[in-house]
Amino acid sequence: MRAMQMKGYGGSEQLQLVELAQPLPQSGKVLVRVHCASVNPVDWKRASGALRLIMPMRFPAVPGYDVAGDVVSMGAGVGGFSVGMRVHARIADMNAGGCADYAIVGAAELVAMPDGMPYDVAAALPLAGMTALQGLRDGAGLPMAAAAGTRVLVVGASGGVGHIGVQIAKQAGAWVTGVCSGANAPRVRELGADEVLDYTRGDAFNGVAPFDVVLDCVGGDPGPWLRLMTAQARYVSVIPGPMTFIWPLLNPFSRRRVKPWMLKTNADDLRYLDGLWQRGSLKVIIDDRYPLPSLGQAWQRSISGRAVGKIVIEVA
C-alpha cells in the first residue's frame, strides 16, 4: 500500500511516498480502506519536534489522525461493524497512520458515517470537531442546550477548530463573537456568529462588552484577552502555550479560569457532531483538497495560517 512516511523529525521535506505492507488488524482493531484523511496543525508540529517532550514520535511514522473510509476487516472481539461499512474516526494511537491507503483504527474510536455524508467532510470533522465540542462543553463548562445569555468569544473563528466552535456555541444558545481577518468575516457570519471582530484593525476591540467564555484556537496566552473577559470568565486554549499553565499559578486568587485543553478521543462525541451535521445544524468548511503524494504542500498550506476550515487529503 502507499503511505506518506517520515523517518525523522523535520518539516514537510521529510515526507516520502513509500510502499508498505498492508497491516493486519489485531484484537479490538479495524482495518479501514482510507478514502480521505485531513490535516491538523498537530501533525506538522509533532513532526517538527516542537512537541517531542510531551508527544514524542516513533519513526518511521505515517502521520494523519483523521480518516474516513470503508471497513476491510476486523480483529478478534470487534462487533458492531461489517465489511464495507462507511466509517470515520480520530485515530487515538500517538503515531496515527491515516495518510495511507489503509489504516488501523481502534474499534472504540470508529463511528459509522451518517447517510449522505461525503468522505471529505467525514475526514475533516473528527479531531477539529471533538476539540471544539470538548473545549466549550468540558473545558469552559458551556451547557450544550442552555447557554442563552452567555457571551462566547472564539479566537481563530475561521480555522479548522474555530469555525466548528462558532457553530457549536451558537447551537447551545450563546451570543457568539468570532475573531478573524476581515477577509474571512463574511464566512464566519454565515456560520451564525452574531458579531465578527477583525483582528487586523487596531480599534476592533474598542467598546466590546466582556465575554464569559473565550475559546482560543490560535495561541496559548490569555493575556491579550483579559480585558475582554468578565470577572468570572473561562478561558480555554486548544493550543496550550506556557502562559496557559503559568497564568493560574501567578494569579491564584483570580475567579477567572484559565485552562489548556487536550482532545480526548470519544466516539459518542463524534456521533453527536454527526447528528448536528445530519440535521443541517453544522457545516464543515473545506479549504482545499490535495492528493496523498502532495501531503507536504497541504502541510505548507496549514502552516501558512491562511486556511479557512479544514484541509483534506484525498487518498482513494
PLM regions: where:
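N-terminal Rossmann-like NAD(P) cofactor-binding module of classical short-chain dehydrogenase/reductase
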Residues: H88, V214-L215, V236
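C-terminal hydrophobic helical "lid"/dimerization subdomain
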Residues: A267-A316
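Glycine-rich beta-strand-centered segment in the early N-terminal region that forms part
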Residues: A21-V39, L51-M94
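A short acidic, Gly/Pro-enriched loop at the edge of an enzyme's catalytic core
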Residues: N206-V213
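A structural motif shared across PLP-dependent enzymes of the aminotransferase-like
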Residues: M94-A107
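Mid-domain Rossmann-like dinucleotide-binding core that forms the NAD(H)/NADP(H) cofactor-binding site
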Residues: S82, A123-D198
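Glycine-rich phosphate-binding loop and adjacent beta-alpha segment
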Residues: G220-L282, V315-A316
